[in-house]
Amino acid sequence: MKILVVTQYFYPEEFKINDLVKGLVDRGHEVVVLTCKPNYPKGKFYKGYKFWGVNEETLYGAKVIRVPVIPRGNGKSLRLVLNYFSFVFFSCLYVLCHRLRPDRIFCWDTSPILQAYAGMLVNKQTKAPLSMWVQDLWPESVSATGKIRQKGVMSILTTMVRGIYKRFDVLFIQSRNFRKSIEEKGHFKAEYVYAPNWAEDLYTEPNNIDLDKYRNLIPSGFVVMFAGNIGAAQDFGSIIKAAELTRDEKDIKWVIVGEGRKRAEAQALVEQKKLGNTVTFLGRYLSYDMPSFFVHADVMLVVLRDEYIFSLTIPAKTQTYMAFGKPIVSMLNGESNKVIEEAGCGFTANAGDFKALAANVIKAKNMPKEVLSRMGNNGRKYYDANFSKKRVIDLIAKKIENQQKP
């Protein structure tokens, strides 16, 4: 079966779509990926790529077509708008100029949802069944991260999103709560299929971890580790307030592994509060290095700001930490806390409740190591039963294969 995958992001950028494409190829399908020149997350093209021209290459056994795109730069609003719409323009232009005749069309919907337009255009030409894996809810996620808040713009985006959902036959959703938000925008013909995210193999099968590789970077003590993007959604103001409340617990160390547009602001706040002995920023490292950091953590931290949109989602790091067998401390609302509590793999606090977060960290620090270890094992068992990569890829692949042309 010929499957067209439309995604703005693809290898060497690190997203779940890479695994899914490989999984579809492994099942014997002929896969074509329509994407752009890689530039995420640093905002500039990876080595070997430039703006002009269309690149064609083979990755994971799939044919990969890369159209031009304006790189996202520093991630500010105007540059992101140019980045998003340039991919829409060049991907649709490619579709209009080339004959693509897939049997199925699959769109990967992390922000921006607008990338689906190229897939919709191929659907209009061929009537091939159309499916999409919804990773972010638009336009709510744009508003919640502070990128766009003007009511007029939000109204236009809502109309565009409504028009996109209307065209799809199947909507895979990474959180069950997504369905409610989508249906608030209208009644669509799409079938909803719950397809949660999985963790990368290096977390589920962490073989040959170099325990000493980064040991000298990790302060001694009870380590609360955050790993990932330091952005508006992560509410570092509240994280730092929680760290401040644990200042007198001298052996509690908050370790931040990651990068993002709010890092400088967060570091300035740490300096202002004189928390240099409590909070350590280590910067960004490649994903394959993460197990060498995680292994030194006592608990892993998951945080999202107090926004309705964030209460509907399960941040991917939840599955990652569960897969790695680490207990979790959270400060967020909704679905992710339900999962942590159901699995019995950590301590939950509501979004913005830095006092509860601090209390949970102190509680975890005072627990016997074997109790924390049991929590981590609970998380891994829950992950294997509900979120494993093979289970989710098989579910998505079978649904795509069984779609019927109208």
Question: Model-found features: residue ranges?
Answer:
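Carbohydrate-associated surface elements
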Residues: 37, 177, 195-198
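Membrane-proximal helix-turn-helix segments that form the acceptor-binding/catalytic region
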Residues: 96, 114, 121-125, 152-171
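Acidic donor-binding loop of glycosyltransferase active sites
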Residues: 169, 294-311, 326
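Conserved donor-binding/catalytic core segment of Leloir-type glycosyltransferases
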Residues: 199, 217-234, 239-243, 255
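Nucleotide-activated donor-binding/catalytic signature segment of Leloir-type glycosyltransferases, i.e.
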Residues: 257, 264-292
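A short, well-ordered alpha-helix in the C-terminal region of glycosyltransferases
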Residues: 363, 370-385
